[in-house]
A protein has these predicted regions:
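C-terminal regulatory/interaction module of P-loop NTP-utilizing enzymes
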Residues: 1-358
């Protein structure tokens, strides 16, 4: 999306770079770096960083509008920094703070007596950063000074109303990345953007079970369509190899979801596991008896109520926190869970989730 926006909407090319935890000013602006000379002796030269290299591509000869250059019919070049908050980005781009306002940047040179020179930043130059705030344990925080230089746009996960369309695009991209293979057991309805009715029934069932599992997981951690695509790639390969359908789904979910769920609280992993096995009400009935368990499961209980669309959920959440849900309330919850939650026979995936919760 970050690449397509400049291309499609504004007709700009984009250089994409992935930030890492060891990024410094040299990676963004540049600096003096050693290299081997023609005589195999070490010499020092200027090596520009990703932002400076992108800005330089906008100029053909000198500064000013007459010096602007079009590249492959694009109006200019922007910079995309992927995984923006994987780096200590304030330290790496700190020198840019003033430059982004003044539209001039001081860059190092190898000219005698001139350590720095000014590089003009085009008025239409932009930096786009992509970041994921979910994995807070491994991310750097962004300062207020940095945030004031950027406009923030939240891209949420697809809604459940977009189910068929999300499945369609995830499967289409999964098949595209496995090009060269004939997956004759699945067909796509290009017109209506969904899985075609001619798809092999047992494979179609796996496709929807995988989506329903991810949809449940999204109550506890927002995972995007890229994860669904990876799951579908595993399904396609497993089906092509004529493996047992249940094992294919089980392995696909375990391979792609477990690593995403390792950091979740014990209560949430156990709630996901019990929901997939059709045992969620029994789990909550057991946990409500213990004051300690009761407190740790209130949040998971509320998220499941949201998922099944229970009206007046605050009454149920309040009663659960007090350890006092009536029999008729349990019966209503059991009916709704049976209607809204998909029971999936994934022994390995459910067991690993259970182990994560212990």
């Amino acid at each position: 999306l970050a690449i397509k926006i400049p291309n499609v909407i504004w007709n700009y090319s984009a250089d994409i770079h992935t930030a890492t935890a060891d990024w410094t000013t040299q990676d963004v602006i540049g600096g003096i770096m050693p290299k081997m000379g023609d005589d195999n002796e070490p010499v020092y030269d200027i090596q520009y960083g990703c932002v400076v290299n992108s800005i330089l591509k906008n100029w053909s000869k000198g500064e000013g509008e007459k010096g602007r250059v079009e590249i492959d019919d694009y109006k200019g070049v922007w910079t995309i920094i992927d995984e923006f908050n994987r780096a200590d980005i304030d330290k790496a781009v700190g020198q840019l703070f003033t430059s982004l306002r003044t539209k001039k940047m001081k860059i190092p040179t190898n000219k005698v007596g001139i350590p720095y020179e000014d590089l003009k930043i085009p008025n239409d130059y932009r930096i786009i950063g992509t970041l994921n705030t979910a994995d807070k344990h491994w991310l750097f925080k962004l300062s207020d000074a940095l945030k004031s230089r950027f406009a923030f746009i939240e891209v949420d996960i697809p809604s459940k109303e977009q189910k068929d369309e999300e499945i369609y695009y995830a499967m289409k991209n999964a098949m595209k990345e496995l090009s060269g293979h004939d997956f004759d057991f699945v067909s796509l309805d290009e017109k209506n953007k969904k899985i075609a009715e001619t798809t092999l029934p047992e494979f179609k069932e796996m496709v929807f079970d995988a989506y329903n599992c991810l949809d449940l997981v999204r109550c506890f951690k927002k995972l995007g369509t890229a994860i669904l695509k990876l799951i579908y790639q595993n399904l396609l390969v497993g089906m092509k190899m004529k493996q047992d359908p249940r094992s294919i789904l089980d392995n696909s979910l375990s391979t792609n979801l477990i690593s995403q769920l390792e950091g979740l609280p014990q209560a949430e992993n156990q709630t996901i596991s019990a929901s997939l096995k059709g045992e969620i009400i029994n789990l909550f009935k057991n946990k409500i008896k213990s004051p300690q368990d009761n407190e740790s499961y209130v949040s998971s209980f509320e998220k499941i109520l949201d998922y099944i669309g229970l009206e007046k959920k605050k009454i149920y959440v309040n009663n659960f926190s007090k350890g006092n849900i009536q029999d008729d309330q349990w019966e209503k919850l059991e009916r709704l869970c049976a209607e809204k939650l998909t029971t999936i026979n994934t022994d390995n995936f459910s067991q690993v989730l259970q182990d994560l919760g212990n």
